[in-house]
Curated annotation (Swiss-Prot):
pH effect on activity, per entry: Optimum pH is 10.
Result after altering residue 286 to E: 4-fold increase in catalytic efficiency with L-lactaldehyde as substrate. Shows expanded substrate specificity
Pfam family, one: Aldedh
Higher taxonomy: Bacteria, Pseudomonadati, Pseudomonadota, Gammaproteobacteria, Enterobacterales
Natural source organism: Escherichia coli (strain K12)
Keywords: NAD, Oxidoreductase
Result after altering residue 286 to H: 15-fold increase in catalytic efficiency with L-lactaldehyde as substrate. Shows expanded substrate specificity
Residues annotated for (S)-lactate binding in this entry: 161, 251, 286, 443, 449
Free-text function comment from the UniProt entry: Catalyzes the irreversible oxidation of L-lactaldehyde to L-lactate. Also shows high activity with glycolaldehyde and L-glyceraldehyde. Has weaker activity with various aldehydes such as methylglyoxal, propionaldehyde or benzaldehyde. Involved in the degradation of lactaldehyde produced during metabolism of L-fucose and L-rhamnose. It may be involved in several other metabolic pathways.
Documented effect of changing residue 286 to T: 6-fold increase in catalytic efficiency with L-lactaldehyde as substrate. Shows expanded substrate specificity
GO cellular component entries: cytosol; protein-containing complex
Active site: 251, 285
Name this polypeptide is given: Lactaldehyde dehydrogenase
Amino acid sequence: MSVPVQHPMYIDGQFVTWRGDAWIDVVNPATEAVISRIPDGQAEDARKAIDAAERAQPEWEALPAIERASWLRKISAGIRERASEISALIVEEGGKIQQLAEVEVAFTADYIDYMAEWARRYEGEIIQSDRPGENILLFKRALGVTTGILPWNFPFFLIARKMAPALLTGNTIVIKPSEFTPNNAIAFAKIVDEIGLPRGVFNLVLGRGETVGQELAGNPKVAMVSMTGSVSAGEKIMATAAKNITKVCLELGGKAPAIVMDDADLELAVKAIVDSRVINSGQVCNCAERVYVQKGIYDQFVNRLGEAMQAVQFGNPAERNDIAMGPLINAAALERVEQKVARAVEEGARVAFGGKAVEGKGYYYPPTLLLDVRQEMSIMHEETFGPVLPVVAFDTLEDAISMANDSDYGLTSSIYTQNLNVAMKAIKGLKFGETYINRENFEAMQGFHAGWRKSGIGGADGKHGLHEYLQTQVVYLQS
């Protein structure tokens, strides 16, 4: 039996062999086989990476933005050259279907190129002064050392979402991938190394959140920590960062409502909602997690929704190309989804189909539809993060908006209607960072991905995401 490959970290421009004894197994969720091992890194490793980033930052910031952008384009070119290799890694370690892995890799390269285009576009200001002969200048300056703590559901793209705006604006960065999906990050570091990016500008530290992650949030040399993950993890990062008043950018959980009005295009609504729920086996924070259907079309919609959900094929993505879903990420995730559904049934919900984990190897949970659901049930409030759709009927738009807003989360929402007035009322009434009208829940790189309430602080993408990595310096110049 072959020994799984043991990965190094990438610190200060070189791959660093782990000298410790503790390793973390990386498991293929489709087969439960160990596919690699990574160092169980410690705070000391994170400190070394932060120190390297601090040393590199002044010289990196001194480069013209257009030169920093040229380095980003070299990275994106390297990604495209290795696209097949990287997508295979994502399939293997994350259980993602092949088509989605390929999209993630291509989108990552495009995203880096998009951010590089901002090199000539982000600007300061000249402000009118009240004093004769004075000029007030507002400069946009880099923060310094930034850190990025990644999730496992879109692990490769999240490297770019944090790294690209950070580097373009003159910051350096230390990245910690999830211990469940680190192999693609190693491939990213190899590209960075091969293109010769200046030492210390990009660093990769491996390990767990409670050790490496806490140091990345709590080290006083860090100017900002950007973290994507659960609310509980975000709370810990925020508390640790608060000790140094370190800026945080947090993208956390979601419980996205989808509202279907009685005038909706049902074929479109069913397809968009099913696509939003089964993508990545339901493990996407911004996709529909609860559905509100107007009573006049409830039976018709539920029948169509059930047919579409039952038609979803799932299996091992390394073996099948005709599937829409792979497994959940690990045994703990599978158990959580099982518990959420079991509790819903205890509270009175009815499982129309699905509802039980698949026996055998792999962490598979089938598409599941829950009916006879009431708003007060836990399944309508707690993030499921699996291919489960609970459906509730409503009378009026006001009722639907009220139930949609009855949530600790505020990331995304959606509504399906052919009435522009209804859509506009929903837009004004829904208290979410994003609202989708007659389409699936998936953001654009030039938009702004930001949640309200417990879904996060700050945001990513577009002009506003770029500015998360900048701070202002105002100069009063008297002549």
